[in-house]
Amino acid sequence: MNILFISPTYSGAGGIGPHAFRVAEKLREIGYNVELMHVPHIPIKNLKNLSFSLFGTIKGLSNKKTYDVVHAWNLPSAFIMKRIKSKKKILSVHGVYSKQVEMLHSKITSGIVTSQESQILDWADVLTTDSKSVQLEYKKKTGKYFEYLPAPLDKTKFEKIVNVEKNPKQIAYVGRDSFEKGIDILRKIESQINGSVKFCTDLPWDETMKILKSSEMLVVPSRTESIPQVIKEAFYLKVPVIATNVGGNPELVVHQETGILVPSEDPEKLVTEINNLLDNEEARRNYANNAFEFINKNFSWDVLLEKYTNLYES
């Protein structure tokens, strides 16, 4: 089977691009022919997605191949997907795209995207999302059904993350240096935390995971989210998590069971919970053990591979 993946990027600490890359790796392992389309873009904030879609569409029009499946990752990739010949078209999203645009740009821009979003979704034969909350929100917003397809955790990648010592009172932030991720909130309260914060915004994955494993906890202060892969990674590394109660975070972080949930944009509550957990070794151990069991039971390739192969084969 010949499959084409289209994504704005395939690298980074998290997000939909690395998700696409991990799926491509696994599919290749089991015999699928997966091609990654690489498209240039203009590295300016308001032009990245627009230039990606434009340059990609031009590239797509010149591609004379016919694929069994074209899989577009994120809404801007759909413009390219539309121009590629294939027997089946799949579009996957992390989060509600128009909502993300409004937070990062303006209500006017978001309004334009919202007016076209439903039509763009119609270009795909199958829609998927990694979050039940996004699945529900799109159902209410557009009436369209998204197949719930979680992003797996590849446990074999962690075999090289060994012999890492804990740094007492160290807290990790892993994610983009971007407004929707709430990094500004964590920076605002950093001086009130009874420990140090390591900000991992642009490091190689291996180095990021070593810092994460050496930390007492991971803090996810996002304003909006789908399902952060880094929470799954922290669970597997037995690093406790404090996350905001937004998007898909509660699908992973069960309050006072697999971690701690706090309201979004509540710096006082966030710093209180961080300091309380730093002082409570037993709670950290319990959350870490529960989370490790949860992630192995629900998000390994052993559990999810068949869902992915069914997506392409059906």
Residue locations for each model-derived region?
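Short hydrophobic beta-strand element within catalytic cores of glycosyltransferases
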Residues: 240-243
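Aromatic "clamp/platform" in nucleotide-sugar-dependent glycosyltransferases that forms part
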Residues: 223
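Active-site proximal beta-strand in glycosyltransferases
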Residues: 69-71, 84-102, 128
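Conserved acidic donor-binding segment of nucleotide-sugar-dependent glycosyltransferases
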Residues: 255-256, 260-267, 276-281
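A short, well-ordered alpha-helix in the C-terminal region of glycosyltransferases
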Residues: 269, 276, 283-298, 304-310
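Membrane-proximal helix-turn-helix segments that form the acceptor-binding/catalytic region
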Residues: 58-61, 108-127
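Carbohydrate-associated surface elements
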Residues: 133, 152
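Conserved donor-binding/catalytic core segment of Leloir-type glycosyltransferases
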Residues: 164-181, 187-190
